[in-house]
């Protein structure tokens, strides 16, 4: 991006924001996995190598947690350990990687999701400081922001809507859908949430305690994949077309600079508010609740 646009400083800012976001997920994930599983510790079993359930000895807990975040942040989907067996908070950070769906871009689409958050940050930043929202010398107006906001909201809508539907069906008739869950309660909810997060984020990994090879799961996750893999491509391309048709405006004292660390912090804030906080209630019911129950709090 820096070479094509001849804006190396902006490219470094984008890379820095992505790196900070990635590290904020991978560091705690490795920490919690290396600390072991509280439920196993209560049995008097030593966990010098960390939580090793569902992991290969050659990788260990640290490398397994590291790759879990790598594969969920980049829509990779390959795994070197069973994500379903990871400690609750490591599973939470893996889910957040797919829920944010922006750090380092995705397979086949690059950083197209991050581009949406840049547009939103430009508009919000311009309004906050009273400057004209501009990006790469082109005015960012209502049409572009509406498209960006719709694209940003489709992702949580599909994940939370799908999770809500499956939770409603399971709670209403658990005997009919008993094959879905081997681990009901908080972890079962996490399995629902992870499945739709993976489908929506173009990932492919899963909490494999979920019995998901059924017509219901294949159809619902297929619809989520169809919606969340094509619309997020169409929207940013439409925004790019609108900006390309506008007259170039030279930078002035009233232009919000998009290559500074301040703007990078603003992008992180927008990602945190629009993407991460939208999922906080669901994460509270799933992995967070499981962690507190497992820890005896």
Task: Tell me what each language-model feature is.
Residues 2-36, 108-113, 145-167, 228, ...:
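Selective recognition of specific alpha-helical transmembrane segments in multi-pass small-molecule
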Residues 49-52, 138-156, 177-188, 255-270:
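Interfacial and helix-entry/exit segments of alpha-helical transmembrane bundles
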Residues 252-297:
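In a subset of proteins, long, contiguous C-terminal domains/tails are tracked
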Residues 2-5, 127-141, 238-259:
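Alpha-helical transmembrane segments
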Residues 124, 166-170, 232-245, 276-293:
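Membrane-helix cytosolic exit motif
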Residues 116-120, 125, 129, 147-187, ...:
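C-terminal catalytic subdomain
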Residues 217, 222-270:
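C-terminal structured "cap/appendage" subdomains that terminate the fold
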Residues 39-109, 175-227, 282-297:
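P-loop potassium selectivity filter motif centered on the GYG triad
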């Amino acid at each position: 991006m820096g070479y094509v646009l001849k804006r190396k400083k902006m490219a470094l800012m984008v890379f820095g924001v992505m790196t900070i976001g990635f590290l904020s997920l991978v560091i705690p994930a490795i920490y919690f996995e290396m600390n072991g599983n509280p439920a196993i510790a209560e049995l008097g079993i030593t966990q010098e190598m960390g939580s090793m359930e569902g992991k290969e000895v050659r990788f260990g807990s640290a490398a397994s947690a590291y790759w879990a975040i790598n594969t969920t942040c980049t829509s990779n989907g390959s795994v070197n350990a069973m994500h379903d067996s990871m400690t609750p908070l490591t599973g939470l950070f893996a889910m957040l990687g797919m829920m944010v769906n922006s750090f380092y871009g995705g397979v086949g689409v690059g950083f197209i999701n991050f581009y949406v958050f840049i547009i939103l940050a430009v508009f919000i930043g311009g309004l906050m400081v009273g400057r004209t929202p501009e990006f790469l010398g082109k005015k960012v107006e209502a049409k572009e922001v509406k498209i960006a906001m719709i694209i940003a909201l489709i992702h949580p809508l599909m994940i939370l809507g799908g999770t809500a539907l499956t939770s409603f069906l399971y709670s209403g008739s658990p005997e009919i859908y008993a094959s879905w869950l081997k681990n009901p309660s908080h972890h079962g909810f996490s399995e629902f949430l992870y499945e739709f997060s993976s489908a929506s984020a173009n990932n492919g990994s899963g909490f494999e305690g979920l019995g998901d090879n059924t017509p219901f799961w294949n159809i619902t996750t297929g619809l989520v994949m169809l919606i969340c893999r094509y619309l997020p491509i169409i929207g940013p391309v439409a925004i790019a077309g609108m900006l390309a048709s506008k007259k170039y405006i030279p930078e002035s004292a009233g232009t919000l600079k998009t290559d500074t660390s301040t703007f990078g912090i603003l992008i992180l804030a927008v990602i945190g508010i629009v993407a991460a906080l939208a999922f906080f209630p669901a994460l509270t019911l799933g992995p967070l609740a499981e962690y507190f129950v497992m820890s005896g709090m």
